[in-house]
Amino acid sequence: MTNNLAKVESQPEISLFFNEYPSALGLIKLLVVNTEKNEIFLLMNMNKKLFLNVIGLAIVVMTCTMCQRPTTSLPSSPEEALAELLAGNERYANEQCINPRSDMDRVEETAPHQAPFAAVVGCSDSRVPVELLFDQGIGDIFVIRTAGNNVNSEMVMGSVDYAIEHLGVKVLLVLGHGSCGGVTAAISAGEHEHGNIAHLLDTIRNDVRDYIGKAESLDKAILHHTLVQVDRIMAYPHVAEKVENGELLVKPAYYDVNTGKVSLLQ
């Protein structure tokens, strides 16, 4: 039996497979050893077709194992929370995502309540999927998305307060991003919108007046606008107090839509 396995294993195309997936060989050898006494495989004389069927079984088992997402402990301090976000983004930008806490067990775990360790005020732009770009799972980040990541409204600040006061997040990130359509429209001298969009652009425009008509300064306008939102949040005494007491970090950041990387601005 073992000789038959060695013969098939030595065939070039199968040897190539095992070089690529060594764990599959270990599983198949285990199957052979455990079934040798019952002479199950002797019925087929371990021909190539049977062996490839066993390989298929090995792949199924390996796939099921890979579907069990790795778990990591959640951060317990503001500094750890920020580090976890940045580490997750590094994994994302390097195509090494682990997709933690994203299975049905996590769905069931978070169904009764949420306890995110971070909050992110980001843009509504479809190119900025917050949980994905930080490689975080279900219930990890409280996400507040508005056009232009603007916090200049009671509704948005109400969401920020909820994250800080009731959910107890340890870090709040205001995330601007490259090629932001809201800021682009706000600094464009030729833009004429109506209704709600006009009101939205006026709100952003108030923060970037020095850049109106200067399309070449878009990136500077985006960075400035992001910093203004952080200043606006920090102007609330209860937020500033938590930061001063070491209970919370409030940071501005920038997401590069070309590279997938997040950079802190302060």
Residue ranges and their predicted role:
Residues N45-I55:
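Bacterial N-terminal signal peptides that target proteins for export
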Residues N3, I14, K37-N38, K49:
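Polybasic, lysine-rich low-complexity intrinsically disordered segments
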